[in-house]
Amino acid sequence: MTTREFDYIICGAGSAGNVLATRLTEDPGVTVLLLEAGGPDYRFDFRTQMPAALAYPLQGRRYNWAYETDPEPHMNHRRMECGRGKGLGGSSLINGMCYIRGNALDYDNWATHKGLEDWAYLDCLPYFRKAETRDVGPNDYHGGDGPVSVTTSKPGVNPLFEAMVEAGVQAGYPRTDDLNGYQQEGFGPMDRTVTPRGRRASTARGYLDQARARPNLEIVTHALADRILFSGKRATGVTFLHGSARVTAHARREVLVCSGAIASPQLLQRSGVGPGEWLRELDIPVVLDLPGVGRNLQDHLEMYIQFECKEPVSLYPALKWWNQPKIGLEWMLNGTGLGASNHFEAGGFIRTRDDDPWPNIQYHFLPVAINYNGSNAIEMHGFQAHVGSMRSPSCGRVKLKSRDPHAHPSILFNYMAEALDWREFRDAIRATREIMRQPALDRFRGRELNPGADLKSDNELDTFVRARAETAFHPSCSCKMGYDDMAVVDNEGRVHGIDGLRVVDASIMPIITTGNLNAPTIMIAEKIADRIRKHKPLERSNAQYYVANGAPARGGKPARAPAVV
């Protein structure tokens, strides 16, 4: 590095950090150091650039921190996968590319918390629009000139997508043309962070490509943040490991922690900010006893409901190695074909009970039967629904195990700890079976492969969930925003009790949102970037949005009644 002092130091070049680096350096008089523990975003590496290759980065450690939980007490004491992105782009470099913002009522609910009144949906919507360029053009809900390239599914990609959406409608649930528009609730096409040329649209591509040549931005990869430095109760810089060297950089204005819901609380704790009793166990000098750091950890858990496909229209042949060179060549030369899609092109959100105020279950439809990380592929034509509950009351924690920055922390999500979790997963399995029984899927639907049609009782379904449910890779809320005793940051991401230090990423969500987390994380960073720059907030939207207000979860009876259990 040519200088050791910057206005801002950003720890983590992921979904949020790249937004901040790009927006802050729009001011030519501001200098920014962006630190990333992983490597560059190689634009010719098919593992991260080809949408259909999304499982590959999760199978190694080049782009994946590959965290693992402690034995989960309610999940047969399994140690469960917790993949997080490592490299420029962070988790936007390895995620499933589903662009889902969450439900409007998620943000309206945040705004009911003391001090978070300006996080209501209509306050957030302008920042979602600012970040986005949608291929079908802008409207009241979508942007047309933002850094994130969003494409929406088009008809005719695979007959299974249209059949699964139609089956949801036949089961009595709404149809929606836009899961990010007026009405999230219902079934419809899925927006994706994929470019019109069929490449992954990570924040490294969308944001950093605009900023990396600016003289006031310095990007250092393979730079592992060790500790935040303090003078009293003010953050003054960061010590990081770069190769064999330990480097210290000073921040004239602020240190911005954007390391994600696992690594952000880990870095704070290692630096002496966190629950005092945890820090003293490791002989870490306590800068500030802040009990919420690492607590309130939330995630989405999901399961795969899989069926045999009677017609040869699934992606099963694409899993065979002898077909993959042709798929890869078409993608590389033309940006088209099976390689150009993440194949999550349809999905939906439903309420399983009439008294649920907004959807509590999410669906991703996939025209093949396989685990998200590419494991356990079914050796036949098949299709599946990824199904999971959205706002589990179960919370966990991230706790430092070592002062060594290379050591992974102790992670416990505490999945399925509450009775509501079990009720919602049973409801989800039964609702999914009813959807899959509808006439739209008659020509495709074969045997139920998982859980298996013979599993019907509550105990049998619970046993399946306990053994087979997996993470949806949505950790969040471990440095939550708010003003209660467990809050870590205020409504602008500033760490309570510390000057010159913010956390800006999914960890500051007070409650997890309804859907995938990449889009909300980008929005959070856009909104706080304006606060850091002391810009006037974008004008509040006046767009309309759907509120159930006690309406039935289904608008009518299913075309085909559920099977008798």
UniProtKB/Swiss-Prot annotation:
Which sites bind FAD? 7-36
Which reaction is catalysed here? choline + A = betaine aldehyde + AH2; betaine aldehyde + NAD(+) + H2O = glycine betaine + NADH + 2 H(+)
UniProt cross-references to PROSITE patterns, sorted A to Z: GMC_OXRED_1, GMC_OXRED_2
**Which Gene3D superfamilies has this protein been placed in?**
FAD/NAD(P)-binding domain, Glucose Oxidase, domain 3
Q: What is its EC number?
A: 1.1.99.1, 1.2.1.8
Q: What class of enzyme is it?
A: oxidoreductase
Q: Which cofactor does it need?
A: FAD
The pathway to which it is assigned is: Amine and polyamine biosynthesis; betaine biosynthesis via choline pathway; betaine aldehyde from choline (cytochrome c reductase route): step 1/1
The family this protein is said to belong to: Belongs to the GMC oxidoreductase family.
**The protein's name:** Oxygen-dependent choline dehydrogenase
Please tell me the species this chain comes from. Burkholderia mallei (strain ATCC 23344)
